[in-house]
């Protein structure tokens, strides 16, 4: 029996080997206890404020919307210590690990941002850290690999399968199956077996809470829409959670359209996948005709994931949130627009959300609308990828 509901509608659950059930139960009990413990909450809040740098700014983009009637704000998770929203929930889970008496942390990472956040939290709190990362991602995210190693983490390249995030997830789970007595698996997104989707949402929900307070202070009303990119879905659910009951606020999640949905080279399981069991949960995923997990693709390593968190699947199924896709080229155009228009270098992941916001503005320039994009991370890690693409195009 679980203490919290393991499902969001029909999605979610706890589909793991029996050997891991006690570890998941211990984690759930520790989380429920910690949520009621003023000392834990005070320590978490202190770390978020004085170590990570919360609250993050809400920045008005004046140049990108020039000549239109839209007001576009960015929630600046890129300004957080570590460079992305990942730091929020990593600090929470690392504190939970200490609470459970664990001495080691296992993590998976795609773009490397979760790995960096995990490495910094482990260095801060005195925990051993090993991070599984697809061999392809190790190559395309070398700055983050070095950052992790600088902070004492062991980075383990995964060469199996497609050598990307899904394979890193599999290896991390395999490791945890043999080490759960001393190690905590610090999952990096709002997916996986219960209670992870709930824990990650709660440790990210300050994104939406701060956004709501800030936009009310600046504009005196709630936004017409909040937008966030969706891979596994943690930055998006962190933004959406506090707005779910505000039914007049549109929640828009942006999946990676890759080379175009029709090409098959994408990472958009919510709109173009089928429900199945993967990574310990029931959720939409990219599958072949015979039910095997299909390779996902995105220019952004952090969105290159063949499934999606179960709460997003539920919000999609009941029509509370809308999910769309943005191609690599559209994301790259938005990346360049923000660099040149506002002097902000965004992560390629976040650029997907920005691209859809810019589409909305272009489609109705005379419409008075108030939009907030969760700028989930900064683009330092992506500059070499973007450089190579722009060089091939002759743009630099």
UniProtKB/Swiss-Prot annotation:
The reaction(s) this protein catalyses: (1S,2R)-1-C-(indol-3-yl)glycerol 3-phosphate + L-serine = D-glyceraldehyde 3-phosphate + L-tryptophan + H2O
Pathway: Amino-acid biosynthesis; L-tryptophan biosynthesis; L-tryptophan from chorismate: step 5/5
Listed CDD domains: Trp-synth_B (cd06446)
The protein's Enzyme Commission number: 4.2.1.20
Cofactors demanded by this protein: pyridoxal 5'-phosphate
One GO molecular-function entry: tryptophan synthase activity
Domain of life: Bacteria
Leader peptide range in chain numbering: none
Record PTM N6-(pyridoxal phosphate)lysine, positions in chain: 86
Assigned GO CC terms: cytoplasm
Pfam families for this protein: PALP
PROSITE patterns xrefs: TRP_SYNTHASE_BETA
InterPro entries: Trp_synth_b_CS, Trp_synth_beta, Trp_synth_beta/beta-like, TrpB-like_PALP, TrpB-like_PALP_sf
Keywords of the record: Amino-acid biosynthesis, Aromatic amino acid biosynthesis, Lyase, Pyridoxal phosphate, Tryptophan biosynthesis
Entry-linked PANTHER family: TRYPTOPHAN SYNTHASE (PTHR48077:SF3), TRYPTOPHAN SYNTHASE-RELATED (PTHR48077)
Similarity annotation: Belongs to the TrpB family.
Assembly and oligomerization: Tetramer of two alpha and two beta chains.
Name recorded for this polypeptide: Tryptophan synthase beta chain
């Amino acid at each position: 029996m679980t203490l919290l509901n393991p499902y969001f509608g029909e999605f979610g659950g706890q589909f793991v080997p029996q050997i891991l059930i006690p570890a998941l139960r211990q984690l759930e009990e520790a989380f429920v206890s910690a949520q009621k413990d003023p000392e834990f909450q005070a320590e978490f809040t202190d770390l978020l404020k004085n170590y990570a740098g919360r609250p993050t700014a809400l920045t008005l983009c004046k140049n990108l919307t020039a000549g239109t009637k839209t007001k576009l704000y960015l929630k600046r998770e890129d300004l957080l210590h570590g460079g992305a929203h990942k730091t929020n929930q990593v600090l929470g889970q690392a504190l939970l690990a200490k609470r459970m008496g664990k001495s080691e942390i296992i993590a998976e990472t795609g773009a490397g941002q979760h790995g960096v956040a995990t490495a910094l939290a482990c260095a801060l709190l005195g925990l051993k850290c090993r991070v599984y990362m697809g061999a392809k991602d190790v190559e395309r995210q070398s700055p983050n690999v070095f950052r992790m190693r600088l902070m004492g983490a062991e980075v383990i390249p995964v060469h199996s399968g497609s050598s990307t995030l899904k394979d890193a997830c599999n290896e991390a789970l395999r490791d945890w199956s043999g080490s759960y007595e001393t190690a905590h698996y610090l999952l990096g997104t709002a997916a996986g077996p219960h209670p992870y989707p709930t824990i990650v949402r709660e440790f990210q929900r300050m994104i939406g809470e701060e956004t709501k307070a800030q936009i009310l202070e600046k504009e005196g009303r709630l936004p017409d829409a909040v937008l966030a990119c969706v891979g596994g879905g943690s930055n998006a659910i962190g933004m959406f959670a506090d707005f779910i009951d505000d039914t007049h606020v549109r929640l828009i999640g942006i999946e990676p359209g890759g080379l175009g949905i029709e090409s098959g080279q994408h990472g958009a399981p919510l709109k173009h996948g089928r429900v199945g069991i993967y990574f310990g949960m029931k959720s939409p995923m990219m599958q072949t005709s015979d039910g095997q997990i299909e390779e996902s693709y995105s220019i952004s390593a952090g969105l290159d994931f063949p499934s999606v968190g179960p709460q997003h699947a539920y919000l999609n199924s009941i029509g509370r949130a809308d999910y769309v896709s943005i191609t690599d080229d559209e994301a790259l155009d938005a990346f360049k627009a923000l660099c040149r228009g506002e002097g902000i270098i965004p992560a390629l992941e976040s650029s997907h959300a920005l691209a859809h916001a810019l589409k909305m503005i272009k489609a109705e320039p005379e419409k008075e609308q108030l939009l907030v994009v969760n700028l989930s991370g900064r683009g330092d890690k992506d500059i070499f990828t973007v450089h190579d693409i722009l060089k091939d195009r002759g743009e630099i």
